[in-house]
Amino acid sequence: MGNCVGRQRRERPAAPGHPRKRAGRNEPLKKERLKWKSDYPMTDGQLRSKRDEFWDTAPAFEGRKEIWDALKAAAYAAEANDHELAQAILDGASITLPHGTLCECYDELGNRYQLPIYCLSPPVNLLLEHTEEESLEPPEPPPSVRREFPLKVRLSTGKDVRLSASLPDTVGQLKRQLHAQEGIEPSWQRWFFSGKLLTDRTRLQETKIQKDFVIQVIINQPPPPQD
């Protein structure tokens, strides 16, 4: 993992008053997903909480807020397998990567920014849980009031899939439809739109999604059991 902050802690970037000298090289963002194991198994909700805590507090310590915002957007794009967008965000903000990962980055002033690995990919021992959201999910509206439209979702494998959806549909219902079409367990699916994670109870109409927009689906398939 190179210089990545692989433990569940993060090293603070160099303070702006004492910028570290930026590395002389800048490598393109690598497409390979970083693999790591948490010190303790965590649920998807716990992972989201840790990420929110980091992104909410990191700009308060040091560095420039616009750079943190760009790094957050690039991290979400990379995790959604849209590396072209992630690289464009980094280039637009003049962020350099000495090692080709978001673990260590520099802005044009030479300030260093370090992202913890849990902000870049989920751990291999992530607990896949069935939340109460599924059992509390509102019933589907009667077929007579459904106005269906093709919904395009892009899997983290790079494959595009079209689902038959309507605005009152919940993400949980669409996860099950994707499971029926592609055989991907709902508990393996994490849906993102505009950089935000969509919960199972979120209805499409709440996302303000428009025609031809794409929802990113990250697949966290558990590794096969080792003999």
From Swiss-Prot:
<dbReference type="Pfam" id="PF00240">
    <property type="entry name" value="ubiquitin"/>
</dbReference>
<feature type="compositionally biased region" description="Basic and acidic residues">
    <location>
        <begin position="24"/>
        <end position="35"/>
    </location>
</feature>
<protein>
    <recommendedName>
        <fullName>Ubiquitin domain-containing protein 1</fullName>
    </recommendedName>
</protein>
<dbReference type="InterPro" id="IPR032752">
    <property type="entry name" value="DC-UbP/UBTD2_N"/>
</dbReference>
<feature type="domain" description="Ubiquitin-like">
    <location>
        <begin position="149"/>
        <end position="224"/>
    </location>
</feature>
<comment type="function">
    <text>May be involved in the regulation of cellular senescence through a positive feedback loop with TP53. Is a TP53 downstream target gene that increases the stability of TP53 protein by promoting the ubiquitination and degradation of MDM2.</text>
</comment>
<feature type="region of interest" description="Disordered">
    <location>
        <begin position="1"/>
        <end position="35"/>
    </location>
</feature>
<dbReference type="InterPro" id="IPR029071">
    <property type="entry name" value="Ubiquitin-like_domsf"/>
</dbReference>
<dbReference type="InterPro" id="IPR039869">
    <property type="entry name" value="UBTD1/2"/>
</dbReference>
<dbReference type="InterPro" id="IPR038169">
    <property type="entry name" value="DC-UbP/UBTD2_N_sf"/>
</dbReference>
<dbReference type="Pfam" id="PF16455">
    <property type="entry name" value="UBD"/>
</dbReference>
<comment type="subunit">
    <text>Interacts with UBTD1.</text>
</comment>
<dbReference type="InterPro" id="IPR000626">
    <property type="entry name" value="Ubiquitin-like_dom"/>
</dbReference>
<dbReference type="InterPro" id="IPR019956">
    <property type="entry name" value="Ubiquitin_dom"/>
</dbReference>
